[in-house]
Structures are given as C-alpha cells and as structure tokens.
Amino acid sequence: MDDEGARKVDEKCPLCQADRYLNPNMKLLINPECYHKMCESCVDRIFTTGPAQCPTPGCNKILRKAKFREQTFEDAQIEREVDVRKRISRIFNKGQQEFDSLQAYNDYLEEVEILTFNLIYKIDVEETEEKVKQYEKQNRDSIAANSARAAAEARILAQNEILLKRQKQEAREAAIREHQKEKERREQVEQQIIFDLATSGKDPNKIIQLSDSLKKQQENIASSVSNISRSSSILLSDVQQVAEDTTPFSPLAGEKDGSKYFSYSKNTYQDLYLEKVSHEPGRKCGFRIEDCHLRCLYEAFSGIDYDLESLKKLEVAS
C-alpha cells in the first residue's frame, strides 16, 4: 500500500474517532469558516437542525451544514489560501484594458495581492475585510459585467474545444473509412487475379504484370491527388498571407538616409583588403564592406557645405 493509501486508512474523525479502517466509506468534511475536520456523520448529527458552533475546542465559529465539503488538499493552510484567492479574484476581476496605463494596472494588482496576503496570514483582518466589502459595494456593476464577460469567454472556449474534438473525430473516422475502402479494393484485385489465373487461358505472367501495373497506377493517382490537395492548401495559405499585407517593411517609414553629393554602388569598386577581411570567421556576423565604404564617403563629403568666409563675417560682426 502506498503512502497516500496508508494515510487515508489512518485518518480519523477528531470528534468521534471513527477511522477508514473500520468504515471505508467515511468522508471527512471541512467548513471554509474554520477548516476543522469532522466526519459526515458528525456533521449530520450536529448541524442538521440548523447553524451551530464548531465542536472543535477553542473554536467559536458558527457553522452551517450547507457549507461543508470534502478537502481537496492535504494541508489545510493551502486549502484556505486557495479559497481566499478564489474569493478575491471573483471580486477584483478587472482587466488591463480598463486602466489608462500599464503602471496603473500593476498598482491595482499589487494592491490586490496585499489584501490577499493579509487575509491568508491573518494580518489586520478586520481592516482588510472592510476594504474588500467597500470595494465590492462601490464596483458592484463592473464586477458583474466582468464576471459575465469571463463566463462568455469560457463558454466560447469550451465550444471551440468541443468543435475541435469533433473535427478530429470526423477526420479519424474518414481515415478509417478510406483505409477500409483501399483494403477492399486490394482484395478485389487479388480475387480477380486468382479468378483470371484459374479460368483464363492467358499467360499467367502477363496477368500478374497487368495487375501490378494497375496497382501502380492506383497508387500514383492517390499520391497525385494528395499532393495536389496539399499544394493547393499551401498556395491558398500563401495567397492569404500576401493578401493580408503587401507593403514592404521599412524601419524608417520609407525615408532614405542618403547623400545628395554621391551615390554608392558596390559593383564599381573592388577593395582587395576588405574583401579579404570580410571572409574571416570572426567578422561574419553583421560585417559589411559597404558600411566601411559609406563611412569613408560621408567623412569626405561632411564639410562640403561649410562656408568658412560667412562664419568669419558673423564672428566679426558680433
């Protein structure tokens, strides 16, 4: 028996001391008000008549039978943290699109996490609960709208998953039917060959060669059809991509950073030194001879518009 099975057998109800060894169908339940365990029989015995105080010594919480449920996690602290986070996420359910900036959304998430942390570790619980209730009261309409939108998105996602599963199932069934038809065709060809060999007076070798050629023709036709359908789908996807955007990418929005004094053509000048350097393995990544040539040209023409005499006259006048 594994550790989990041994743990379940050894579990006991803290109130009546019943265990799973004598009662394999025993269920241990918890209430999210205090997370104290007790068996289903004790819950029925204590809380059937109405709300009552938790029978665990030192706990003064008033519990209701409708809120008891089975524990999901072995650690009660983790169980409580998950419940707190579910409750807070249902109230603070705003999305990033509802904020003017990313910083405002991050501040909102930080505030929500602080409130969640305080409730999980019981820090300023009364003050934190008051903030949560005040927020829920002030944003009741937006909370309901966001919940409805989330539910609609979940429904759409579930419908898409169902549709995808249905399409996969139909594709599998179609493949099985096609495989069965192909198998039946092959059996018919084999039976026809046997029949011709038994009843016909023709040369058996010619009959076998004819059947082999027919099989090859069928295989070629099937492969051609599959290739055509595959190429058609590829061409369709390519056409759709081209139709979406035919504008070439330009990082400068079409602007060209050229010079009005010269034009550069890499085919009219041969630089033997840089040609040799460009083939070195350490300069492969990002090294271009054109950049070196353009830099030299820009340096040569950079002062061509500089009017020294006009500048001297301005200095004398000042």
Curated annotation (Swiss-Prot):
UniProt superkingdom: Eukaryota
TM stretches of this protein: none
GO process annotations (BP): DNA repair; nucleotide-excision repair; regulation of transcription by RNA polymerase II; transcription initiation at RNA polymerase II promoter
Entry keyword set: Cytoplasm, DNA damage, DNA repair, Metal-binding, Nucleus, Transcription, Transcription regulation, Zinc, Zinc-finger
Single GO cellular component term: cytosol
Cell compartment(s), UniProt: Cytoplasm; Nucleus
Molecular function (Gene Ontology), one example: ubiquitin protein ligase activity
Summary of subunit composition and partner proteins: One of the nine subunits forming the core-TFIIH basal transcription factor. Also interacts with skp1 and with the mcs2-mcs6 complex.
Protein's UniProt name: RNA polymerase II transcription factor B subunit 3
Origin species: Schizosaccharomyces pombe (strain 972 / ATCC 24843) (Fission yeast)
Gene: pmh1
